[in-house]
C-alpha cells in the first residue's frame, strides 16, 4: 500500500478542508462514475489514488468543474440528437 503525504496535496489545493472535498469528489467519480484514474492504481483505494492525482497536479477543483461541465454538455447534445431523431421519425 502506498503512503501518501497529505501535506504535499494540501499545498496543491490550499487547505485541508478543500483537499477533503476535492479528494472525495474525485474518489466518488472513480467509484461510482466509472472514471479511470490518471495515475497507476498500484492496488490502492480510490481515496489514495485521488490524493496522488492531486499531489501530482493532475486534479484540482477547477479541473473537476470543467470535466463535469463538458460531460454534461455531451450528455445534453446526445439527448437532443435522440429527441430530434424521434421527432423526425414522426413526420
Swiss-Prot record:
GO terms for cellular component: DNA-directed RNA polymerase complex. It is an enzyme of class 2 (transferase). One of its GO terms (biological process) is DNA-templated transcription. Its EC number is 2.7.7.6. The keyword Nuclease does not apply. Keywords: DNA-directed RNA polymerase, Nucleotidyltransferase, Transcription, Transferase. NCBIfam families: rpoZ (TIGR00690). This is DNA-directed RNA polymerase subunit omega.
